[in-house]
Structures are given as structure tokens and as C-alpha cells.
Amino acid sequence: DVVLATKFGNVRGEDGSRLGISGKPEYVRSACDASLKRLGVDHIDLYYQHRVDPNVPIEDTVGAMAELVEAGKVLFLGLSEAGPETIRRAHATHPISALQTEYSLWSRDPENELFSLIRELGIGFVAYSPLGRGFLTGSFQHYEDIPEDDFRHNQPRFMGENFEKNLQLVRKIENLAKQKDIMPGQLALAWVRAQGNDIVPIPGTTRTKHLKENVAAVDVKLSAEELQQIDAIFPMDVTAGDRYSDMSGVNI
């Protein structure tokens, strides 16, 4: 089965330029209609707010999203990169089915508060960038391996000393993966899945080879000893550098 999920929130101009974030009810409705038209479908299974708009009460945004459910245009609602208080307020307005937030070996922040909260409320967790934007696959052994026009050039974890420190961690993951005769990325995905049945990783790729590797990670099982070894390599907050150069748009 295919679950069709899409987001709204990043407003763009006709030329594709970024115009900021909007959670205004009228934008929620117009964005949904535009997505339905582009996708050629009569409903969206899971509709996310891409980023919380700090200038619009979450009750107003989710209220408009709830109207889409009532109209049959959307089946379930989701949030992305929302903080605990926002999640509670949103869920009180209309049941939230999924929270999409970055989570991987090198981004373990959700373990602090979010996991206990969403499990209390019965919200599923969708882990984006479970491969650390490709870094955990071992694809980048040198800073020069990153294409010049790639957005990762300006991401803190991929720059300078941070790159080198994080690379040393990944090399240890590569060694563990080699012992299991799997790819580093498969080990990283298996670790995410091992954190709970309510966690769904969504790795992205542009290559069929990597897609097949990611799918095959479903069959990778990690023992308690292996999980301990991985935790010892990548404990909370060991990663050098922030996730983004500007962290103001997350955990709101």
C-alpha cells in the first residue's frame, strides 16, 4: 500500500523564491487545493504542516487543517519539527497522527522529550534524514566529495573541523557494518527502526541502487550487544555542529 503524504507551509513566489512560512488558515486551504490539483488525486492521506508558523496560533492552523478532514480532502494530520507545547495544543484541537522530525544516529534530540510525549498521545513518529543527509552512509570521506552546488556545503556538520570529527564516528559505524556484511546506511536505518515500532524512517535517494539498499535494511536485525556498541559510538550530543545553520525554525 502507498500512503500519500505531502506538506504545506513554505510559501514561494512565482519565480520559486522563498517568501517565508505561513500557517494562516486561508493559506492552509489554498495550499491543499493546489496540492490535490498537482497530484491529480481527490484526497491526501497525510497532510503535514512543514514548519510551525510562530505568528499564527497553532489552534488556528490545525483548525483549518481539521476542516480539510471534514471536507474529505485529507484523512490524517501531521506536524513537522514542532515542539512539545505546540504538539499538545495542536492535538487538543484535532488528533495529530504523525510528527515528522529529523532523527538519526547523529540527531538524537527527539529522545529528550518528544518520544515520551508522542507515545503518551498516540502519535506516530516519522524520522526524516535518518541517514544524516547521506553522511552516515560513508559517501563523504572528504569535504571535496560534496558537490559545489549542494546545500550541504553550508551545513555546520559538513564544514571544517566538524566534518573531520563526524567522519571519525562514521568510520566506526563502517567497521560495524562491515562485520555484519551490510552497508553503513543499512546499519543506520536498522538502528532507527530498532528504537520503536512507532518510528518510521523515510530515507531519500536519487539512485536506484541506494533505494534497493534502503529497502533491504528492513531485514537487518541488530542484537542487544550491537545496539550497545552503536550507542557507545554515537551517544546523545556527540555529533559536532548544529543540524542547520539557522535553527530558529525547529522545535517551535
Predicted regions: what they are:
Residues 21-23, 93-97, 115-119, 142-146, ...:
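Short, hinge-like loop/turn segments at secondary-structure boundaries
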